C-alpha cells in the first residue's frame, strides 16, 4: 500500500482558515490556531445574529409605527387593535415603510383604525369633571 503524505491537505486546510480570517486584527489573522478560534466564533456569531436580525427589525418597525401613530393621536397598541377590527391586513414592515415614506397614507390608516375602535370606556367622562 502506498504511503499517504498529508502535507497538501494540511496546507490547504490552514490556507482556507487564514483566508477566512483576513481582516482580523493582530495574531487572529496570522497565526493558525488563533485564526481558527476566531473564525469558529465568527461563524457562531453570524448564525446567531441571522436569527436575531429578524427580531431587531421587528422592534425597529414597531418603534417607527408607534412614533408615527402617536403623532396622529393614537398609541401603537390601539392603532394595531383598530386595524384588526377594521379588517386591514398590513404587516408591520409595510406600516413602518408607509410611516416613513408615505405619511398621508399612514394618516389615512390611522383614521381608519380610529373609526373601527370602540369608545374607550376606561377614560374619565368629560361631564364628571364639571
Swiss-Prot record:
It holds the Pfam family Ribosomal_L20. Keywords: Ribonucleoprotein, Ribosomal protein, RNA-binding, rRNA-binding. HAMAP family: Ribosomal_bL20. GO terms for biological process: ribosomal large subunit assembly; translation. This is Large ribosomal subunit protein bL20. CDD domains: Ribosomal_L20. GO terms for cellular component: ribonucleoprotein complex; ribosome. Binds directly to 23S ribosomal RNA and is necessary for the in vitro assembly process of the 50S ribosomal subunit. It is not involved in the protein synthesizing functions of that subunit. One of its GO terms (molecular function) is rRNA binding. It comes from Leifsonia xyli subsp. xyli (strain CTCB07). The keyword Plastid does not apply. Belongs to the bacterial ribosomal protein bL20 family.
